[in-house]
UniProtKB/Swiss-Prot annotation:
PANTHER family: 3,4-DIHYDROXY-2-BUTANONE 4-PHOSPHATE SYNTHASE, GTP CYCLOHYDROLASE II-RELATED. GTP binds at R48, I49, H50, S51, E52, Q69, E90, G91, R92, T112, T147, K152. This is GTP cyclohydrolase-2. GO terms for molecular function: GTP binding; GTP cyclohydrolase II activity; zinc ion binding. Its cofactor is Zn(2+). InterPro entries: GTP_cyclohydro_II, RibA, RibA-like_sf. It comes from Campylobacter fetus subsp. fetus (strain 82-40). Keywords: GTP-binding, Hydrolase, Metal-binding, Nucleotide-binding, Riboflavin biosynthesis, Zinc.
């Protein structure tokens, strides 16, 4: 599959001054890297892989912790250096329309995994080959991965993962069950639900 790369541009944001570079995968998926202007790829780089969540990232949905994780990651990268890789994989890669349908099923009592299965999808449809491509493109060989997701830890093949940096957000009344399912059924490393 052909991947087209953009130039690098500056991006001042409310979280700090960053640079950005975009990658177009095939005809449709455009991913974004947000990184420190002084990124040193000869050292271990702090990396967050964040999958798009329009309802959380843009609208502030309380049904997930996506926006809070993204904002915490950008603050961390601003302070410590590194990169956020923003993947266009809405709804764990089932797309926005199917995600809304999954939300409707959840409104009727199914959990996030049951809803995906009801729609004919796996619990998590995401893949991370593009992340390997991006890390290679930057020349990054060693990372600290900001994640709670064991699938992300297991999926990266082109780099050495020095350590996992947890990025936990306290649950609320709307996402507590969702996060508990991620912990109990998907193996997410969430300390709140181990106490």
């Amino acid at each position: 599959m052909e991947i087209i790369k953009s130039n690098i541009a500056n991006l001042p944001s409310r979280f700090g001054k960053f640079q950005i570079k975009s990658y177009k995968e095939g005809c449709c998926k455009e991913h974004l890297t947000i990184f420190s202007p002084n990124l040193d790829v000869t050292k271990t780089v702090n990396v967050r892989i964040h999958s798009e969540c329009l309802t959380g990232d843009a609208i502030g949905s309380l049904k997930c912790d996506c926006r809070d994780q993204l904002e915490a990651s950008l603050k961390y990268i601003n302070k410590h250096g590194g990169m956020v890789i923003y993947l266009r994989q809405e709804g764990r890669n089932i797309g926005l329309l199917n995600k809304v349908n999954a939300y409707a099923l959840q409104d009727n009592g199914l959990d996030t995994i049951e809803a995906n299965h009801q729609l004919g999808f796996k619990a998590d449809e995401r893949t991370y080959e593009i992340v390997d491509f991006i890390l290679k493109d930057f020349g990054i060989k060693s990372i600290n991965l900001l994640t709670n997701n064991p699938l992300k830890l297991a999926s990266l093949t082109c780099v050495n993962i020095e350590k996992r940096i947890p990025i936990e957000i306290e649950s609320n009344e709307f996402n507590k069950d969702y996060l508990k399912v991620k912990k109990e059924q998907m193996g997410h490393m969430l300390d709140e639900f181990t106490r």
